[in-house]
UniProtKB/Swiss-Prot annotation:
Name of this protein: General odorant-binding protein 1
Cysteine disulfide partners in this protein: C37-C72, C68-C126, C115-C135
Expression sites (tissue/organ): Antenna.
InterPro entries hit by this protein: Odorant/phero-bd_Lep, PBP/GOBP, PBP_GOBP_sf
Keyword annotations: Disulfide bond, Olfaction, Sensory transduction, Signal, Transport
Function: Present in the aqueous fluid surrounding olfactory sensory dendrites and are thought to aid in the capture and transport of hydrophobic odorants into and through this fluid.
Quaternary context: Homodimer.
Length: 164
């Protein structure tokens, strides 16, 4: 009986870790468009630096230009419809383009869609997208999907070293 409990616990932990690693990969992949979107969204160097701390508990969703940057980044990967709502099929393909992305794709799409419905009445696309991002982050934290800043930074440093 104890062996079964241990095996089930290990499997649950491995699944949770896999989810976090997939989220880390999607985050870093999505973030690749940030530099290209900095000017278009009028993001200062300081605010761009803040953006790298998205998963920190103290990250503030206060500045409209952050929403504009997320909108630009989403457009860069063709993840939005003409009305600046999530394009479900393209978002699914984007998430599945990462290792083990199929594990989280539907869950992420459902969370984003739920958040979009909550803020659908916001007429300003940048503000709405910023609110959706905050809602999505909260949903990820509640479901244990949010990667730690340590994990994000470690991967970022490894990628930077590999580029040298």
């Amino acid at each position: 009986m104890w062996k079964l409990v241990v095996v089930l616990t290990v499997n649950l932990l491995q699944g949770a870790l896999t989810d976090v690693y997939v989220m880390k990969d999607v985050t870093l992949g999505f973030g690749q468009a940030l530099e290209q979107c900095r000017e278009e969204s009028q993001l200062t160097e300081e605010k761009m630096e803040e953006f790298f701390h998205f998963w920190n508990d103290d990250f503030k969703f206060e500045h409209r230009e952050l929403g504009c940057a997320i909108q630009c980044m989403s457009r860069h990967f063709n993840l939005l419809t003409d009305s600046s709502r999530m394009h479900h099929e393209n978002t699914d393909k984007f998430i599945k383009s990462f290792p083990n992305g199929e594990i989280l794709s539907q869950k992420m799409i459902d969370m984003i869609h739920t958040c979009e419905k909550t803020f659908d009445s916001e007429p300003d696309h940048c503000w709405r997208i910023l609110r959706v991002a905050e809602c999505f982050k909260d949903a990820c934290n509640k479901s244990g999907l949010a990667p730690s800043m340590e994990l994000i930074l470690a991967e970022f440093i490894m990628e930077s070293e590999a580029d040298k």
